[in-house]
Amino acid sequence: MHAPNRRQILSLLSSVSIGAAVLRPERLFAQVTSLQDIAASSFPTPRATVFVAKEIITMDPGRPRAEAVAVIGGRIAALGTLAEVQALAGDQPYDIDETFRDKVIMAGFVEQHVHPVLSSLTMSSEVISIEPWDSISGFSDQVRDEVTYQERLKAALAAHTDKATTFLSWGYHHYFHGPLDRTILDQLAPDFPVVIWHRSCHEMFLNSLALRQFGVDEAFMATFTPSEAGQSSLAGGHFFEQGLLRLLERLGSLASPARMKGGLEFTVDFYHRSGITTCCEPGGFVDKSLQDAINAVYSGDQIPFNHYFIGDGSRFATAHPADPAAMLAMAESVLGWGSGRTRYLPQQVKLFTDGAIFSQLMQMKDGYTDGHDGEWLMDPARFGYAFQNFWDNDYHIHIHNNGDLGMDVLLDNLEQAMRRKPRFDHRMTIVHFGFASTEQVNRAASLGAIVSANPYYVTALAGRYEDVGIGPERSARMVPLADVKAAGMRMSFHSDMPMAPAKPMQLVWSAVTRTTAEGDVSGPDQRIDLDTALKAITIDAAHSIRLENEVGSVTPGKLANFTILEQSPYDVAPEDLAALQIWGTVLEGRVQPVLTPITRTELRPSPMPLGMAPLRRFAETHEGHDHTDSCAAVRYALSAAVARNLA
């Protein structure tokens, strides 16, 4: 007879949920009587904390709602009504914490795809973007037309009084804000350097003084490869993709130590204010010195969340294009690079197919209405080499994909792998999920894939893309989550910040309403229900990075990670979900109220120093390496530029 698993044990406990990890199956019913019985041993019985709430939304189908939760040693020990939990406690000492008596406890939010370095630098610039942002300098409202963008940019330039410093702004998008080049910027700001960073993070525009300040001239351009030169215009002050990556070699002073440190600290506060207790960056760094520098800010015990990283499989494949054993060894080598609250997830890697949706560089079967072409971030042959080798070694593979043509490449590789070496519960994850047909979704489901989607694409882009590049029919199918649910696939949400604000409830709102920035509803048939959307930021998000046994639901045995809400999401209208107020979080039993949002002049000192020496070592060892991987490439180039500036 097989021993019962945790789910079976819990189902035997009727209406009261308690931890069962220490129970012997043969004495199950005799021993499940109280918390004291469970904890009884020769060691002193620890004191429990019992949190009482107006409502506890557990995200556990075995007990969807509760009134009280007991926590011992940072983990959930019991769940039920207050009377049930008190009865279970018996003689074990406990304290009742009524901090949340009039609030709602929910399973801690899981944000499984963010980019802290890019977020730090964008949020510390002058943000003028196509959507509203909370940045270091305060709230920045959306700008979605050329006239208003010009007005906002002129006002920001006029307020830039220190002419010796470079003005940096992020958020410009040519499909919304009209043309931009060196000549226009020279007219707007003839007497100080200006750098405009595109919303996609893949392009920059510089005025003449900025080009001169950073030494970007004909001599520097002569060192560009043909492909780099083809994606650069010195006359226009415009650098994109590979051209941008070369430009960043000269822009290290933009990412000053103060900007980096303040930006990283801001992301800590931003994630916390959004109710996040677990976050992850797929495609983590491939240099330990750089990881150490990030750990210096993120690893301290006082940080209000745990931050995970997933190795960048495309980098490993690029480094060892004909040596699978060396590629796999490189993937293993990063696993010990975490520290404290930062750590790498084992047996997981991120790969890439096509280009970014914000730049309309995804690979689309029917192309673009204006005739431009998409791009491959990993060419299909290199992608196949990496995918099949990681698959054969039982890796959980996360794949950046946005276009339906890229989806075919992804699914062809998955089917080939399943026919060669069938695996079950492989959880191959389709990341971003910009466009896919119903047939592709059903095929993905039949092959055992899961989806990690960014539903904010619909909010930010669907309205505009109806008119530019994509057209109304395909735009209405952007991020087709109803198809995913109908196919029986598990889905999770992510922001990919700074591609969207790291606000899980805003992602829920986007998925449930599919409301565009223009106020319309795009593809109403692809809206999903609230239950499914909330799972996508809790238990299913945890499942997507194989942490569902630790986080994602209020379940005995898991970490006591909670998001504290002022109101239940089930009690507000769908259109109000994004505005749901977050009181704070609980991390492993530690109560963490949200503090007053910081501003540029109120940056709190970091409790740990940002590691600058590791960044210098990173610069020395990463000159001239290959850049092909979208945001990952920009992150590496920026980090190298920072390091050179600090050397």
Where are these regions (language model features)?
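A generic secondary-structure signal for well-formed alpha-helical elements
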Residues: 17, 116, 160, 192, ...
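Divalent metal-binding segments
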Residues: 12, 35-52, 57, 61-327, ...
